[in-house]
Amino acid sequence: MPTVDDILEQVGESGWFQKQAFLILCLLSAAFAPICVGIVFLGFTPDHHCQSPGVAELSQRCGWSPAEELNYTVPGLGPAGEAFLGQCRRYEVDWNQSALSCVDPLASLATNRSHLPLGPCQDGWVYDTPGSSIVTEFNLVCADSWKLDLFQSCLNAGFLFGSLGVGYFADRFGRKLCLLGTVLVNAVSGVLMAFSPNYMSMLLFRLLQGLVSKGNWMAGYTLITEFVGSGSRRTVAIMYQMAFTVGLVALTGLAYALPHWRWLQLAVSLPTFLFLLYYWCVPESPRWLLSQKRNTEAIKIMDHIAQKNGKLPPADLKMLSLEEDVTEKLSPSFADLFRTPRLRKRTFILMYLWFTDSVLYQGLILHMGATSGNLYLDFLYSALVEIPGAFIALITIDRVGRIYPMAMSNLLAGAACLVMIFISPDLHWLNIIIMCVGRMGITIAIQMICLVNAELYPTFVRNLGVMVCSSLCDIGGIITPFIVFRLREVWQALPLILFAVLGLLAAGVTLLLPETKGVALPETMKDAENLGRKAKPKENTIYLKVQTSEPSGT
């Protein structure tokens, strides 16, 4: 009986239907980018200092310049690493004293300014920015700076818990229903976040968005990879992820045009309501329908694909089914990912790779945001470098395979982080170049692990397998903001050292996975178990006997 891949070879693996579905679903990938890394602009922290109403009043009376007013409000920045005093402390002075002069009011209070008492910024901060961010609106600086880390960690926590539920939902009730449900919740929560009256409500809507947005992205990814044959799967998988890069570039332009975070949030959220139109544009996955014994519906969709591609349905289409496996369970469960020793080993390796790739990818972005000279240009450069990374992945996957390029890309990312440790912060241009090299390497690794992860699991548990393994990427995303911002306070190079170790180790364990180049998607547990397994010597012997016996009988 023919499989889905057999039928696709006859009706078209990458025909008009697949191209149309690909372009439509790529919009989901592009829309996911502002959610995933939007913190760079939504949570931008500009230069700031304490606000002092007393100094402002005296400045107005004395006609001071802004620089003079700042000089009498906060202590100087001093050596590197002591900027905290200027941003989070101010002079505790009674500015209503009549003895204060306009020339040097602090001189009459102390001969040395270091003897003046310092206090917290009780009256807020003054931010040096023409726009606004969640940092400037909710004062997420100084003692509350960790709340910005929590904002991004909360999103990744939503990714983590949502991945398991959405993945199970997609395998149990279908890819299409999962896609539409997550689109609706994601759009509504994104708009509500733009109208958040306080930090806690904003955090709640961000968590809700995290619970569904990654599942929405993965549902689209799974659909497009299941619509095409094995010959086109590698291309559409990487191009789908390249659409994420297009979303990053578009985000840069939107952030530059809309410097106020609420307008930016609305601009990236409102258009996602249009994805509900996919109800009429995208069919259910025939592979999933077959795994649920809904053969009639799967045959109908395959017939639709044939018509869209201008092909006649093959004569054996009505015999379409999955290969029989008496041990197969149609209802996916977490235990299926660990049922055999081979699957168990692969699952653990994939989990570590997802964790490492997430920490390095988000870590490099946040590190760039914390050390950037021009935030918009630096973000744009680091986003554009993902495009050649995608083409490198396409070329190497076609000619070399998945495993060796993925190992080399992790090695490149880890080595880049190691090199950045020894580059002076004053050489900003060199830091950006090395960071872009590392960003390209980790981008290639992420593109490939998405492809490899989907290729190592059978159909009935594929979506759950991708979701569970990629949940380690969310754990990495939860801790990455704290790694970047909190460890930098201990030692600026400490996050980069950790990134380098993780990347170099990931390069080694990648080599333990089987190659999947040119191999059809496994449809049963037996297919998945046999990936990378060589033929037994006994089978080879029988084959040789058959070949040698034929000539003697003629």
Swiss-Prot record:
The chain crosses the membrane at residues 22-42, 150-170, 177-197, 207-229, 236-256, 263-283, 348-368, 377-397, 403-423, 432-452, 465-485, 493-513. Optimum pH is 8.5 for the transport of MPP. While optimum pH is 6.0 for the transport of the drug quinidine, no transport activity is observed at pH 7.5, possibly due to the protonation of quininide at pH6.0. Changing residue 283 to A: Decreased TEA uptake. The modification Phosphoserine is found at residue 333. Changing residue 408 to V: Does not affect transporter activity; no changes in MPP(+) uptake. It catalyses: 1-methylnicotinamide(out) = 1-methylnicotinamide(in); dopamine(out) = dopamine(in); serotonin(out) = serotonin(in); (R)-adrenaline(out) = (R)-adrenaline(in). Phosphorylated. It comes from Homo sapiens. NCBIfam families: 2A0119 (TIGR00898). GO terms for molecular function: (R)-carnitine transmembrane transporter activity; acetylcholine transmembrane transporter activity; dopamine:sodium symporter activity; identical protein binding; monoamine transmembrane transporter activity; neurotransmitter transmembrane transporter activity; norepinephrine:sodium symporter activity; organic anion transmembrane transporter activity. Glycans are attached at residue 71. This is Solute carrier family 22 member 1. InterPro entries: MFS_dom, MFS_sugar_transport-like, MFS_trans_sf, Orgcat_transp/SVOP, Sugar_transporter_CS. Changing residue 465 to R: Reduction of the localization to the basolateral membrane; no MPP(+) uptake. Belongs to the major facilitator (TC 2.A.1) superfamily. Organic cation transporter (TC 2.A.1.19) family. Widely expressed with high level in liver. In liver, expressed around the central vein. Expressed in kidney. Expressed in small intestine enterocytes. Localized to peritubular myoid cells, Leydig cells and moderately to the basal membrane of Sertoli cells in testes. Expressed in tracheal and bronchial ciliated epithelium in the respiratory tract. Also expressed in skeletal muscle, stomach, spleen, heart, placentacolon, brain, granulycytes and lympohocytes. It is a multi-pass membrane protein. It is found in: Basolateral cell membrane; Apical cell membrane; Lateral cell membrane; Basal cell membrane. A motif (Proline-rich sequence) lies at residues 283-287. Residues 1-21, 171-176, 230-235, 284-347, 398-402, 453-464, 514-554 are cytoplasmic. GO terms for biological process: acetylcholine transport; cellular detoxification; dopamine transport; dopamine uptake; epinephrine transport; establishment or maintenance of transmembrane electrochemical gradient; metanephric proximal tubule development; monoamine transport. Changing residue 61 to C: Affects transporter activity; reduction of MPP(+) uptake; reduction of serum O-isobutanoyl-(R)-carnitine levels; reduction of MPP(+) uptake. Changing residue 28 to I: No change in fenoterol uptake. No change in trospium uptake. No change in terbutaline uptake. The keyword Transferase does not apply.
